[in-house]
């Protein structure tokens, strides 16, 4: 377009790295942010939704920042962890590391339904059917492989891309519908205002 030029900027690694570390019990051993950071133009801050993993269960947590380097983890009082809601968890630990892994969160200014102002897309593996036997430590290799084959056949369409909605980015409702079966466990979510369509990649 006349009058515009493209210029590639070279990112500089922040000396403060890592800017987010798992320093709370509910965050486990690692934090993963994927693409879940946005700038809230109305509030003038950055918001992050990240996954705490490595403790046999997953938690989705929330943090805010003014500069993208120093992040605050507010006590939200939403989810109980070890008997206390003094934490920044917005989605409870379930014991299943693949409950929902957030790919990305968007704040949709055009949404008419206030309860769906924030939208999250992510990977989710729904629980296995009750007739699939549990894997036990005493299973031999043949029995374990047989169980996993049954499990894979039964959950073929029970995992993939799912969505969640929120009025404020803190209180979430997860839709159990698998929107894109067998989608991968990492991706992104954006909104194209020109085409008025959502785009998810996996």
Where are these regions (language model features)?
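Carbohydrate-active catalytic/glycan-binding domains of CAZyme proteins
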Residues: 1-202
């Amino acid at each position: 377009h006349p009058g515009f030029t493209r210029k590639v900027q070279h990112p500089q690694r922040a000396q403060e790295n890592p800017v987010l570390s798992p320093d709370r019990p509910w965050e486990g051993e690692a934090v993963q942010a994927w693409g879940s950071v946005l700038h809230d133009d109305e509030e003038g801050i950055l918001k992050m939704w990240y996954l705490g993993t490595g403790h046999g269960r997953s938690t989705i947590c929330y943090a805010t920042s003014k500069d993208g380097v120093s992040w605050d983890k507010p006590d939200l009082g939403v989810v109980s962890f070890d008997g206390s809601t003094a934490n920044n968890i917005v989605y409870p630990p379930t014991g299943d590391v693949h409950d929902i892994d957030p790919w990305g969160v968007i704040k949709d200014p055009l949404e008419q339904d206030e309860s769906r102002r924030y939208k999250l897309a992510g990977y989710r593996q729904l629980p296995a059917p009750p007739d699939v036997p549990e894997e036990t430590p005493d299973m031999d290799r043949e029995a374990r492989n047989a169980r996993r084959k049954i499990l894979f056949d039964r959950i073929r369409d029970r995992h993939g891309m799912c969505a969640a909605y929120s009025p404020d980015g803190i209180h979430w409702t997860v839709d159990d519908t698998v929107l894109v079966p067998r989608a991968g466990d990492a991706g992104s979510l954006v909104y194209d205002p020109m085409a008025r369509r959502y785009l998810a990649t996996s």
